[in-house]
A protein has these predicted regions:
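Rhodanese-like catalytic fold shared by cysteine-dependent sulfurtransferases
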Residues: 2-8, 18-41, 46-50, 58-90, ...
């Protein structure tokens, strides 16, 4: 009986922790503007005609990316200088594979003065899970 109770508690805690790991849609006001964590649906709708930045490696980008995206690798030593070539007053839409690199890149973009930063919740994985197309 104790083993069953421990197993049930372990499963419940595991599910609870996993549910908390994924970023939820949110809005964070920063010194320079705002960082929005948005759903794939909102990202798809609102990024049309805007700057879309894929912060994955060039190899990951070559294997498939959101149409119209430019690749600025977060791990590139020139990441920030490449970002600064973009218009900081225009919205930017940033994504990676799962959302972790995007969070870092979004904070860096905001710190550099980007006023409207949009972070794809769940990254490209969630984009694909929603049956949205990627291109090579």
């Amino acid at each position: 009986m104790k083993l069953l109770l421990k197993s049930v508690i372990f499963i419940f805690l595991t599910i609870s922790v996993i549910g908390c790991l994924e970023k939820k849609p949110s809005k964070t006001v920063t010194e320079n503007g705002v960082i929005n964590v948005i759903t794939p649906s909102d990202f798809k709708t609102n990024s049309v005609g805007q700057v879309i930045i894929d912060v994955r490696t060039p190899e990951e980008f070559a294997n498939g990316h959101i149409e119209g995206a430019i690749n600025i690798n977060l791990f590139d030593k020139n990441f920030e200088s490449k970002l600064l070539k973009l218009d900081k007053s225009k919205p930017v839409f940033i994504y990676c594979r799962s959302g972790r690199r995007t969070a870092t890149a979004s904070k860096k973009a905001s710190k550099l003065g980007f006023e409207n930063v949009n972070d794809l919740q769940g990254g490209l994985q969630k984009w694909v899970k929603n049956n949205y197309k990627i291109t090579k």
